[in-house]
């Protein structure tokens, strides 16, 4: 990605984890050397209370994977509250997804796959009649899925106003 032209360069960190052990994958959590902090335009931090760099995200709606129908998140929570559910993801930090869902009042089983591992029909088959929640990243790996239990959680990110002002000015 270095040769690609850009107007602004963002670096995203988790404020709680920071740079971890400071080492690159697979020995540590970093995808690039810590020295990159000095060459980016903006640093964004998840779990930060700093209004200039902190960001948060919440579910905005859910898309029924088989039909494409979108439903407001509040309606989904009301409907699913009494149902048996499982959240399955191949995210690198799956607990963030699971905690976000629990923070919305949902109770569910969870299944963490390896980072970038695809959710497969076999994963779904083990789940009986449970409602299955996945991320958009997971859903793109299920292009032919017609399983009526699978819902994709759409996430809305709240960026710092200073960044939004800067992006608008570009």
Where are these regions (language model features)?
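Hydrophobic residues at beta-strand termini and immediately following loops
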Residues: 13, 55, 111, 153
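Residue-level signal for inorganic ion chemistry
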Residues: 40, 90, 132
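Phosphate/Mg2+-binding loops and adjacent switch elements
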Residues: 1-54, 61
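Short, conserved loop/helix-junction motifs that constitute active-site signature segments
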Residues: 4-5, 34-39, 77-81, 127, ...
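A short, acidic, amphipathic alpha-helical segment used as a generic capping/interface helix at domain edges
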Residues: 116-131, 137-139
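Short, flexible loop segments at boundaries between secondary-structure elements
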Residues: 114-118, 149-170
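Redox- and metal-dependent alpha/beta enzyme cores, enriched for Fe-S-associated oxidoreductases
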Residues: 63, 67-69, 75-116, 138
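Short, polar loop motifs at secondary-structure junctions
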Residues: 43-50, 94, 135-140
């Amino acid at each position: 990605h270095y040769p690609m032209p850009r107007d602004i360069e963002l670096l995203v960190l988790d404020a709680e984890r920071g740079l971890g052990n400071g080492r690159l994958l697979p020995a540590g959590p970093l995808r690039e050397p810590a020295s990159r902090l000095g060459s980016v335009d903006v640093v964004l931090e998840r779990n930060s209370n700093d209004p200039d760099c902190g960001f948060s995200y919440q579910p905005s709606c859910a898309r029924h994977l088989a039909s494409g129908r979108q439903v407001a998140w509040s309606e989904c929570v009301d409907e699913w509250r009494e149902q048996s559910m499982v959240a399955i993801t191949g995210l690198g930090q799956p607990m963030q997804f699971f905690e976000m869902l629990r923070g919305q009042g949902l109770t569910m089983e969870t299944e963490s796959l390896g980072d970038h591992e695809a959710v497969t029909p076999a994963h779904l088959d083990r789940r009986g009649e449970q409602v299955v929640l996945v991320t958009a990243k997971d859903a793109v790996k299920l292009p032919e899925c017609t399983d009526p239990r699978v819902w994709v959680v759409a996430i809305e990110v709240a960026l710092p106003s200073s960044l939004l002002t800067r992006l608008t000015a570009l």
